[in-house]
UniProtKB/Swiss-Prot annotation:
UniProt-listed InterPro entries: Anhydro_N_Ac-Mur_kinase, ATPase_NBD
Function in brief: Catalyzes the specific phosphorylation of 1,6-anhydro-N-acetylmuramic acid (anhMurNAc) with the simultaneous cleavage of the 1,6-anhydro ring, generating MurNAc-6-P. Is required for the utilization of anhMurNAc either imported from the medium or derived from its own cell wall murein, and thus plays a role in cell wall recycling.
Name assigned to this protein: Anhydro-N-acetylmuramic acid kinase
Gene (name only): anmK
Domain of life: Bacteria
Residues given in the record as ATP binding sites: 12-19
Organism: Shewanella baltica (strain OS155 / ATCC BAA-1091)
Entry similarity comment: Belongs to the anhydro-N-acetylmuramic acid kinase family.
CDD domains, per database record: ASKHA_NBD_ANMK
Length: 369
């Protein structure tokens, strides 16, 4: 069978780099050919972080950063292809998520905004780009997120196996695969790595808490944890999605102001428990037992995985590598898959997950010609 090569590009809310993957979809399961992470230069990262918070002169900065991010994504593709013997002419399309700078689906006129000009990516790589995956779902009354459950369903579902796929990036989201004719469900549970990363960056100038070691050295404060878990988002019914608009450094500082007596490592431990408890609560509402497979950056945080296991005794806990998909690259592979679905004219959203009025082909195509 002829190879079906697609490239997936993903930069999440944690903004810890652009993940690029080359995937072959000609077989029954996606085959990861090669992968690459392109670091986000510090000046660009600062600009993106500024743009994620309301301020003045946003339109000019948005326009510049849209081009800058497009150039960075193109660089990621070109560097990816230097790692393998696949010519750009053999790649059917690039699926680019872009960089989210606003996700506000619950306004009267909801919207989501990802930047990273696909025209720039297409012209600088010579490969057609499929991008802007989320806004069609929002136009149909949906949340525009999460989009990965459709990929999880096709890749990980098995009759008779009750599974939850947990993606822990900046925000955590779950896909419930019931293993029978019941609906697949999925939604954002709340913060994943975003708050634990923000706190260690603020206090220790380190990009992330490696293996959760700093959190492990602290002790969770139950009063602070209770206050954090009282955020209205956690009691919302699904479909629901969230982002930095709700869970950000400004919100965290506001929550911490009555708790300035706490040691810094105790706050880190509490923030990690916020992630774990909010995930576990939502999982137990769906089912108190099953198979749990974790992907995303959180899969490499040993302390996070240990705490999740303690909160979910009815679940077996693994990463998606046990199902044949590297947890580091799972989301990039999902956006390559979304590009394939667009190319084939197939729907890629799950209305039961996003709340959209119907299934739809997602994304628009930007030609390299």
């Amino acid at each position: 069978m002829k190879n079906a090569y697609y490239i997936g590009l993903m930069s999440g809310t944690s903004m810890d780099g652009v993940d690029a993957v080359l995937v072959d979809f000609s077989g029954a399961q996606p085959q990861l050919i090669t992968s690459h992470t392109e670091a986000i230069p510090s000046h660009l990262l600062k600009g993106l972080q500024r743009l994620c918070s309301p301020s003045t002169d946003e339109i000019n900065r948005l326009g510049r950063l849209d081009r800058n991010v497009g150039e960075l994504f193109a660089l990621a593709v070109n560097n990816l292809l230097t790692k393998c013997a696949i010519a750009k002419e053999d790649v059917i399309a690039i699926g680019s998520h872009g960089q989210t700078v606003r996700h506000m689906p619950n306004l009267e006129v909801g919207f989501t905004l990802q930047i990273g000009d696909p025209n720039t990516i297409a012209t600088e790589t010579g490969i057609d780009v499929i991008a802007d995956f989320r806004r069609k779902d929002i136009a149909l009354g949906g949340q525009g997120a999460p989009l990965v459950p459709a990929f999880h369903q096709q890749t990980f579902a098995e009759v008779g196996k009750k599974r939850i796929i947990l993606n822990i990036g900046g925000i955590a989201n779950i896909t419930y695969l019931p293993g029978n004719s019941d609906q697949v469900l999925g939604f954002d549970t709340g913060p994943g790595n975003t708050l634990i990363d923000a706190w260690i960056q603020q206090v220790k100038s380190e990009p992330f808490d490696r293996d959760g070691a700093w959190a492990e050295s602290g002790k969770t404060d139950q009063d602070l944890l209770t206050q954090l878990l009282s955020h209205p988002y956690f009691s919302l019914a699904y479909p629901k999605s969230t982002g930095r608009e709700l869970f950000n450094q400004a919100w965290l500082e506001q929550q911490l102001s009555p708790f300035n007596h706490l040691d810094e490592e105790d706050i880190q431990s509490t923030l990690l428990d916020l992630t774990c408890h909010s995930i576990a609560r939502d999982m137990i509402k769906l089912s108190n037992e099953g198979e749990l497979y974790v992907c995303g950056g959180g899969a490499f945080n040993g302390q996070l995985m240990q705490r999740l296991a303690a909160l979910l005794p009815g679940y077996t806990l693994n990463t998606t590598s046990a199902l044949g998909v590297d947890p580091k690259w799972a989301e990039g592979i999902a956006f390559a898959w979304l590009a394939m679905r667009n190319h084939l004219g197939l729907p890629a959203n799950l209305p039961a997950v996003t709340g959209a009025s119907r299934e739809a082909v997602l994304g628009g195509r930007f030609s390299a010609k």
